[in-house]
Amino acid sequence: MKAYLVLATGETFAGEIANAKEDVYGEVVFFTGMTGYQEVLSDPSFKGQLVVFTYPLIGNYGINASDFESKEPQAAGLIVSEQSEEGHHYEATQSLQQFCDQHQLPLLTGIDTRAVVKRIREQGDMPAVITTDLSRVSFEEWVPLSERALVDEVSTKKVETFEGNGPHIVLIDYGFKQSILNSLLKRDCQVTIVPYDVSFEVVQELNPDGLLFSNGPGDPKQIEDRLPTIYRLASTYPSLGICLGHQLLALAFGADTEKLRFGHRGANQPVINLKSNRVYMTSQNHSYVVKEDSLQRTDWDATFKNINDGSIEGLTHKYLPIQTVQFHPEAHPGPSDSDEIFHSFIDDVAAKGREKTYA
């Protein structure tokens, strides 16, 4: 069936779709990884977004049972140049098209993705719609992602514990990826997942050894009412922030954030460790960054920077056992170069024990 990607600028790209039932609006972004489409479509950080894949052939290894980052699709739609009709992998349980049909996830094919990405790079991430009828298109009633309670949409509503013999880590869920949980469990941590709006008192009753502030979708300032609690928690327990968690911790301790013209989304983002000068290839998915000039009035030290655009990719607190990274050390998809971040965090937790930093 003929279908279209229509940008908010009015520019239209024609393609084909097999599973369209209604128009789907979202923020159009692009992902530069050659693989990892299954992780992308199920990553809560992509909530509400139409994802353009820059690699020309998507779906060639199908969908399997083990690479999901959440229990359901999170992206609003997928846009590809060409898709493989079959999944050629021994673990594949269905094709990408079959999965999208099953979950009513729009999969728009035959699109000139190079042209779309060029527009995004020139004009920034923007509203867009996948439609089969150009006469229906109207952005007047579309609710921008900046006005949606995205974290509330993806965060857990209950407390859940996974047993382990190591340190007890409370994972504050802003839209966490399954691979972050797996990275802690493989280190034999006991992990308790709590909602994003958890109170200090509830966390205190759980008696954690450390806290992990997870990734998630949207603008960190959408939940700035949580900053006082985040400040109190991170001042009390050794903490690691990843992606959105990194931004929230930065805000809670006095820094500021801003939106990039187009975000970092891919499995090939180079960052440099400012202390060792070691370069890492990292997996990233974010639209917002910490403003470097806002660090001057805080107790943060920058630890990582993006080599491509010089943006802040990591922080450590000068006096408290808090470290943050904008990238994803658990990867999935992507390289595991920065997996040592988890080791460093566990070392902080072990060194501190259950002693509070200060009351």
UniProtKB/Swiss-Prot annotation:
Write out the similarity annotation: Belongs to the CarA family.
The protein's assembly and partners: Composed of two chains; the small (or glutamine) chain promotes the hydrolysis of glutamine to ammonia, which is used by the large (or ammonia) chain to synthesize carbamoyl phosphate. Tetramer of heterodimers (alpha,beta)4.
One GO biological-process annotation of the entry reads: glutamine metabolic process
CDD domains, sorted:
GATase1_CPSase
Record region (CPSase): 1-168
Q: What pathway is this protein said to act in by its record?
A: Amino-acid biosynthesis; L-arginine biosynthesis; carbamoyl phosphate from bicarbonate: step 1/1
Q: Which residue ranges does the record assign to the Glutamine amidotransferase type-1 domain?
A: 168-355
* A Pfam short name: GATase
Q: Which InterPro entries match?
A: Anth_synth/Amidotransfase (IPR050472), CarbamoylP_synth_ssu (IPR006274), CarbamoylP_synth_ssu_N (IPR002474), CarbP_synth_ssu_N_sf (IPR036480), Class_I_gatase-like (IPR029062), CPSase_GATase1 (IPR035686), GATASE (IPR017926)
| Catalytic activity from the UniProt record | hydrogencarbonate + L-glutamine + 2 ATP + H2O = carbamoyl phosphate + L-glutamate + 2 ADP + phosphate + 2 H(+)
Record's protein name: Carbamoyl phosphate synthase arginine-specific small chain
Question: GO MF terms on file?
Answer: ATP binding; carbamoyl-phosphate synthase (glutamine-hydrolyzing) activity; glutaminase activity
Specify the species. Halalkalibacterium halodurans (strain ATCC BAA-125 / DSM 18197 / FERM 7344 / JCM 9153 / C-125) (Bacillus halodurans)
Q: Where is the active site?
A: C243, H328, E330
Top EC class, one word: ligase
Q: Which EC number(s) are documented for this chain?
A: 6.3.5.5
Gene behind the chain: carA
Residues annotated for L-glutamine binding in this entry: S45, G216, G218, L244, Q247, N285, Y288
Q: What does the UniProt record say this protein does?
A: Small subunit of the glutamine-dependent carbamoyl phosphate synthetase (CPSase). CPSase catalyzes the formation of carbamoyl phosphate from the ammonia moiety of glutamine, carbonate, and phosphate donated by ATP, constituting the first step of the biosynthetic pathway leading to arginine and/or urea. The small subunit (glutamine amidotransferase) binds and cleaves glutamine to supply the large subunit with the substrate ammonia.
Entry keyword set: Amino-acid biosynthesis, Arginine biosynthesis, ATP-binding, Glutamine amidotransferase, Ligase, Nucleotide-binding
